[in-house]
């Protein structure tokens, strides 16, 4: 079985939204997993703990470190888990995720604050998401995103190990076959570089 990959959906989305991405990863030889949390709506300490438990379960059952791919809000989970559990994470990949800079430089922050009991500036975790986690990281971003400002999804050079610009809109980043081909290619390149 290939490298396990935990795929975390964006805000107001669930595992169905990442079905094509996971199917493509499986076809490419990876071992993908959905997050199994229903729709990604509220960020709470309990939700974070459950996703952390999901990561630990996958790492334990496969005996391998896990690649985490997070789309939009899911990417914040990916980076958070990479900070908290680096011993379980092989690579953290963000797809159009607003992890850097102004947390209001996107078209979803007002909705996020309506759905949650905290502001975008005071999330329910102490980790600084913009700081590079102690594991390899890839940020995928787009100037055509339309939801998240490119500079917030790209981040500063010292906030990720690699940054890839994709010419797609926000809702295509994890569902377009062309975007998925780039994601799968980046994962294959990482796996090749990881080999001794």
Q: Would you name each region that the model predicts?
A:
Residues 2-16, 20, 24-35, 42-135, ...:
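Serine-dependent carboxylesterase/thioesterase catalytic core
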Residues 14, 142-148, 171:
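Acidic catalytic loop of the alpha/beta-hydrolase fold
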Residues 17, 104, 153, 157-159, ...:
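Short, function-defining helix-loop hinge/capping sites that tune catalysis or transport
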Residues 54, 58, 182-194:
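C-terminal alpha-helix
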Residues 26, 143-161:
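Conserved loop-alpha-helix segment in the C-terminal half of the alpha/beta-hydrolase fold
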Residues 158-174:
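Catalytic histidine neighborhood in serine/cysteine hydrolases
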Residues 48, 174-187:
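Post-His helix in hydrolase/transferase enzymes
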């Amino acid at each position: 079985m290939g490298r396990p990959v935990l795929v975390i959906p964006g805000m107001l989305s669930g595992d169905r939204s990442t079905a094509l991405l996971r199917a493509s990863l499986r076809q490419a030889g990876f071992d993908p997993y959905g997050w199994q949390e229903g729709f990604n709506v509220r960020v709470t300490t309990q939700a974070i703990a459950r996703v952390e438990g999901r990561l630990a379960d996958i790492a334990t059952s496969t005996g391998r470190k896990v690649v985490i791919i997070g789309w939009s809000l899911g990417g914040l989970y990916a980076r958070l888990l990479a900070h908290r559990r680096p011993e379980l994470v092989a690579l953290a990949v963000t797809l159009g995720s607003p992890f850097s800079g102004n947390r209001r430089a996107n078209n979803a922050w007002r909705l996020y604050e309506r759905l949650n009991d905290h502001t975008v500036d005071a999330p329910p975790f102490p980790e600084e998401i913009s700081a590079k986690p102690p594991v390899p990281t890839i940020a995928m971003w787009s100037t055509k995103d339309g939801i998240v400002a490119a500079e917030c999804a790209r981040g500063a050079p010292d906030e990720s190990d690699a940054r890839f610009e994709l010419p797609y809109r926000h809702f295509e980043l994890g569902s377009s076959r062309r975007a998925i081909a780039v994601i799968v290619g980046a994962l294959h390149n990482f796996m090749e570089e990881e080999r001794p």
